[in-house]
Curated annotation (Swiss-Prot):
Organism: Lactobacillus delbrueckii subsp. bulgaricus (strain ATCC 11842 / DSM 20081 / BCRC 10696 / JCM 1002 / NBRC 13953 / NCIMB 11778 / NCTC 12712 / WDCM 00102 / Lb 14)
Disulphide bonds in the chain: none
The keyword Transcription is annotated on this UniProt entry: no
Entries under Pfam families matching the protein: RecR_C, RecR_HhH, RecR_ZnF, Toprim_4
Top-level taxon of the source organism: Bacteria
Any one Gene Ontology molecular-function term assigned to this protein's record: zinc ion binding
SMART domains: TOPRIM
Zinc-finger ranges (C4-type): 57-72
Protein name: Recombination protein RecR
PROSITE patterns: RECR, TOPRIM
Length: 199
């Protein structure tokens, strides 16, 4: 049996989300159909707002409603330390930890030659330019996921910025190989930042 076109389209739309298969998408579509209209309108507006009202910070690449973002424009933040992360969700993980008070730089990915992702496709060039302009920066913390791509990206960035005389550190062991920062618990993240090692 074929679903009516609006349901079929909604199922297809849900299946575009990561980790959502056909069964889950079907369940969500039928749940949405039973939701009150104002809840559906609010959900749809939230999706539109994410695309229309958020942008990347021109300084660090984090997601923001204002430019520069609240972290970059906060005068209390420690400007001597810049933590480089893969995705904006990693910034949220470190901010929730509540221990790090420096700045961030979001790459929006990692080097992955097999997928055609080189240095030009991620936010590396702006990091180098930022470090050249920022006399206050003394340390760059490479807080990338413990995957082969994360490790190779960290080594690539380290080789680029080491000649400038900046201290380059990597998060301490404790994050399992292949694990994502966003899923690490706060204690593990805290220990990884505190025990970081110099490259």
């Amino acid at each position: 049996m074929q679903y009516p076109l609006p349901i079929a389209r909604l199922i297809d739309s849900f299946m575009k989300l990561p980790g959502i298969g056909e069964k889950t998408a079907t369940r969500l579509a039928f749940y949405a159909m039973d939701m009150p209209k104002e809840d559906v309108d609010e959900f749809a507006q939230a999706l539109v707002d994410v695309k229309e009202k958020l942008r990347q910070c021109s300084v660090c690449g984090n997601i923001t409603e204002q430019d520069p973002c609240a972290i970059c424009s906060n005068p209390v933040r420690d400007r001597s330390t810049i933590m480089v992360v893969e995705e904006a969700k990693d910034v949220m993980a470190f901010e929730n930890m509540g221990e790090y008070d420096g700045l961030y730089h979001v790459l929006h990915g990692v080097l992955s030659p097999m997928d055609g992702i080189g240095p030009e496709q991620i936010n590396i060039k702006s990091l180098i330019v930022r470090l050249q302009k920022n006399d206050a920066a003394k340390e760059v913390i490479l807080a990338l996921n413990s995957t082969p791509e994360g490790e190779s990206t960290a080594m690539y960035i380290s080789r680029l910025i080491k000649p400038a005389g900046l201290k380059v550190t990597r998060l301490a062991a404790g994050l399992a190989v292949g694990s994502d920062i966003e899923y690490a618990n706060l204690i593990t993240l805290k220990r990884a930042v505190q025990g970081r090692t110099e490259l």
